[in-house]
Amino acid sequence: MSKVLTLLFLLGQSSIYFGQLFTLRGTCQITRSYCGGVAPSPEVYAQHIAPQPYSGKILYLKKGLKNSLKQKTIAQAVCDSNGYFSFTVTPGDYCIVQEEHTRSYRSIIQECKSSYLQINADCIKQWWINGLQSLSIKTHTTLKPLEFHQACFTPGDIPCIMYTGPMPP
């Protein structure tokens, strides 16, 4: 009888635990390369390359610790003017991704092919598989800032791509 009561107690506790909702929150920051023109003063340059809140950045949440096309996005968050975002989730394993992670990494490579863009295909593949952040949620969680970089003359904030062409007019 005591084993049955213990089992019922444990089942009750696990259903309460797995029914809970937790908040996953964080911030997004972006840095931008200085892309030429008249050289700015050191103060202006420092301000230009300093991390800024990534307002309007759209993030998606997928189940599992790795990105996969088989896993559909289960939630979306848009960063506010301070770069803050949040998701409400049940306990489990998750992967935070951005729009480019919702299609194949091969399509990203294909879209970025240009005589002036150098693409590190292995780097793109690893970035795509790992997503922006993988985590196991067991309680309310605040992440370290997700950091993005906009390189000169490259599409979006995808890493592993470098522009090698002439300065645009």
Regions flagged by a language model, labelled:
Residues M1-V4:
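Positively charged n-region of N-terminal signal peptides that target proteins for export
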Residues L10-L11:
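Short, linear, compositionally biased motifs with a strong N-terminal bias
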Residues G19-L65, Q71, H101-P169:
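Primarily secretory-pathway and cell-envelope proteins
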Residues G26, C79-F87:
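Glycine-centered loop-to-beta-strand initiation motif
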Residues N67-N82:
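Short, acidic Ser/Thr/Gly-rich low-complexity loop/linker segments typical of extracellular
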Residues S86-C95, E100-T102:
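Short Pro-Gly-centered beta-turn/loop motif in secreted/extracellular proteins
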